[in-house]
């Protein structure tokens, strides 16, 4: 393992990671499974927690067929003021980034994501914020690997006290197909309104870690005015990474 830990140690660390997600889900009015679970319950298979595909048990898998919904109204500040909307409800975008990863067979390894690393840099690009300024986080959580990749890309230490979800995550809050992140953003908006002038980070990914997105939100306006960098301008950083050579007829020794 690239972290230098054993299979059992990694299994237990995944259990601890998602146990912390259940603590958030337990307190959520919208979580489909608002139940706090121990690391051991999550890490190891049981009658209630079958092994879906090694090393992931049921409690480590996204529940993405949940009957849920979320909605966000997007408009200009001028329009919102004209409609008489309370300014305390305003949420502003402070950063956004989207990247596309290389095909799976051409990536240099399977334990990190260059596209996610570039996204993590670009979502803060051109502003004064850093990860230290983020009070609330929702890392996309289809499986433990998605959270682990994001934690590495954004430089969040394993012992960082900030929860890595505001919903409880895909296995415990659940999601409506590919619309889970709408629930993440809506939940983030609630947190930011409760703590004005704080900042929240939401990430998303899809496919085989094929595409990534991130946004930073706050009740405060970004000054001076800002416009995002077109993703194609920094996508070239990823596209220019040399592909790993591929053969359909391997021979000789190999390590998996």
What would you call each of these model-derived segments?
Residues 1-72, 76-79, 86-172, 190, ...:
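Conserved "HGTGT" condensation-loop signature of ketosynthase/thiolase-family condensing enzymes
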């Amino acid at each position: 393992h690239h972290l230098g830990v054993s299979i059992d140690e990694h299994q237990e660390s995944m259990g601890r990671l998602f146990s912390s997600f259940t603590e958030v889900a337990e307190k959520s009015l919208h979580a489909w499974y608002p139940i706090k679970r121990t690391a051991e319950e999550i890490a190891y298979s049981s009658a209630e927690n079958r092994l879906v595909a090694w090393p992931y048990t049921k409690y480590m898998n996204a529940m993405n067929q949940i009957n849920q919904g979320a909605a966000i109204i997007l408009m200009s500040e001028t329009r919102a003021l004209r409609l008489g909307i309370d300014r305390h409800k305003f949420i502003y975008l402070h950063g956004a980034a989207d990247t596309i990863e290389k095909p799976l067979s051409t990536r240099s390894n399977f334990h990190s994501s260059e596209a996610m690393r570039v996204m993590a840099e670009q979502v803060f690009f051109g502003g004064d914020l850093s990860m230290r300024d983020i009070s609330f986080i929702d890392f996309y959580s289809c499986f433990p690997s998605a959270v682990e990749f994001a934690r590495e890309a954004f430089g969040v230490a394993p012992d960082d006290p900030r929860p890595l979800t505001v919903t409880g995550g895909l296995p415990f809050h659940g999601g409506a197909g590919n619309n889970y992140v709408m629930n993440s953003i809506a939940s983030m908006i609630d947190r930011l309104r409760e703590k004005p002038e704080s900042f929240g980070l939401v990430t998303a990914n899809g496919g085989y870690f094929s595409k990534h997105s991130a946004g930073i939100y706050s009740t405060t306006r970004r000054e001076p005015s800002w416009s995002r960098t077109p993703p194609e301008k920094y996508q070239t950083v990823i596209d220019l990474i040399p592909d790993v050579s591929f053969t359909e007829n391997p021979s000789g020794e190999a390590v998996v």
